[in-house]
Amino acid sequence: MEMVNIKINGMPLSVPAGSTILEAARYAGINIPTLCWMKDLNEIGACRICVVEVVRAKTLVTACVYPVNEGMEIYTNSPRVMKARKMTLELMLSTHDKKCLSCVRSENCELQKLCRDYGVEDVDAFEGENPQSPLDETTLHMAVSYTHLRAHETELHL
């Protein structure tokens, strides 16, 4: 198996060619958060929580889909990355239905955990309801299910 040499947060690593940045980081025990990623099923980089900084890249890249290259230098927690993840979480919450206290996943929710980790502390984000949301719970569930179904169909070439 061909290997490539990279650095993640200054740590030199040798990882299989063709690996994604996320796979390389996990191999090294480095956590990169994800919300939408599911190995071999949903690798589309849609949520953008897994963004990382690659030296000489013009923009942040999604670690779950971006392949490693020989000599690549990656930073998973630079100020730029942390700011982008926080902004992404804030945008997600701006359209969130905010029924977290009555949700079956309350306190076992990756979104809540990430908001705490990244200092998104808007108390209203986890209480009450979003009166501006045009979607009721049934419509929202259908929309999420449809989005996941379409992603899976694309991955499975159905």
Kindly give the residue locations of the regions a language model identified.
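Fe-S ferredoxin-like electron-transfer domains
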Residues: R48-V52, A57-R150
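A generic secondary-structure micro-motif detector
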Residues: M11-P12, L101
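Single conserved hydrophobic/aromatic residue that forms the stacking wall/gate
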Residues: H148, E155-L158
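Eukaryote-biased recognition of intrinsically disordered, low-complexity regulatory segments
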Residues: E2-N9
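N-terminal cofactor/phosphate-binding cores enriched in small/glycine residues
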Residues: L13, A17-T62, Y66-E70
